[in-house]
Each structure stands twice: as C-alpha cells, then as structure tokens.
C-alpha cells in the first residue's frame, strides 16, 4: 500500500511541476512585458521546493528553453544567458531556507551577476562598436525591470511557500 501511495505522490509531484512549467512559459510568452519574468525568481526559489539538485537547475532552464522556442533564439548571447541562469541556480543553494531576507539578498545579487555576465556577452557579440561601459549603461533599464520582477515573483513564491508551511505545521500539531 505504501508503494502505491509513494508512486502516486511522485506522479502527482511531476504533474504539478509540469503544470507550473507550463504556467511560467505561458506567463512569460503571453502575459508579461519584456524583462518581466519569473525565471530568475524560480531559480532562486527552487531550493525551497525540492532538495533534488538536478531539478533545482533543470526546472528554470527548461522553462527558459521552452520560452525561447516560442520567442525565438537570439544567437551567441544565449550561452551567457543560460550559463548565468545555471550559476544563479547553483548559488541559490547557499541561501538560508525560510529566510525572506536571504531570498531578497540573493534576488539582488542574482541581478548583479546577471547584469555583469549577460551584458558582457552582449558586448562580445555586439557589432555596433559600443564600449563595454556603454553596453552596461544601456542595459540598466532592462535589468531594473528584471530586478523588479525577480523581487515580485520571489515574494509571491515565498508567500505561497510560507503559507503552505504554516498550514503543514498546524496540521502536524493537531
């Protein structure tokens, strides 16, 4: 009986994950403005969701890949985008789980990493003669929107997680 229950729970978790991936792809493609995406917040939040380190990296990467399939691919800069997302997913493992302050610090830090690495890739692949400083400067408005969305979605994910944890502890006490 426990084997059946465990298999059902695993299947249920996979279905929930697929629905979440689909919802993020649809939101990023059809509902949200440019540079307003849950992808970085998800990469930061995955350690709250699962201890499986592969899933922590593969979930945000799969959402980004599916979104890129719909939106279109964008050349060699993609390497920097995907590498940065993987780096952020690895760094997120070192935050204090359960701490909103830690999550927000990692949100800001991830945007700084994103700004430095991805825009360096834009500079390397650019053909308009812009300087590196100019590339970083021109990216600030886009990255500020990305910071706003990362903080916003991190708060939403954290609120949902904290609510679930509150109800779980209430049920366990009863």
Q: What is the meaning of each model-derived region?
A:
Residues 27, 46-54, 90-99, 159-168:
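Structural signal for the C-terminal ends of transmembrane alpha-helices
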Residues 43, 75-80, 133-142:
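Non-cytosolic membrane-interface motifs at loop->transmembrane helix junctions
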Residues 2-48:
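Hydrophobic transmembrane alpha-helices
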Residues 21-22, 56-67, 103-112, 174:
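Central hydrophobic cores of alpha-helical transmembrane segments
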Residues 15-20, 54-58, 79-83, 104-108, ...:
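Hydrophobic alpha-helical transmembrane segments
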Residues 99-174:
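Membrane-embedded alpha-helical hairpins and interfacial helices in multi-pass inner-membrane proteins
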Residues 47-52, 73, 109-117:
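Small-residue-rich segments of transmembrane alpha-helices in multi-pass membrane proteins
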Residues 26-37, 61-94:
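Interfacial aromatic-anchored transmembrane helix boundaries in multi-pass membrane proteins
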């Amino acid at each position: 009986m426990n084997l059946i229950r465990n298999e059902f729970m695993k299947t249920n978790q996979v279905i929930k994950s697929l629905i979440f991936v689909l919802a993020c792809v649809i939101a990023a493609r059809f509902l949200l403005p440019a540079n307003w995406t849950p992808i970085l917040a998800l990469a930061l939040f995955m350690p709250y969701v699962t201890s499986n380190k592969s899933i922590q990296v593969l979930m945000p990467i799969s959402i980004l890949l599916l979104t890129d399939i719909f939106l279109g691919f964008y050349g060699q800069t993609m390497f920097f985008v995907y590498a940065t997302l993987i780096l952020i997913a690895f760094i997120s493992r070192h935050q204090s789980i359960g701490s909103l302050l830690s999550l927000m610090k990692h949100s800001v830090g991830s945007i700084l990493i994103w700004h430095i690495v991805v825009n360096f890739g834009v500079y390397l692949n650019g053909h308009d003669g812009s300087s590196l400083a100019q590339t970083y400067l021109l990216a600030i408005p886009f990255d500020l929107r990305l910071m706003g969305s990362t903080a916003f979605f991190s708060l939403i994910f954290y609120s949902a997680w904290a609510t679930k944890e509150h109800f779980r502890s209430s049920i366990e006490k009863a």
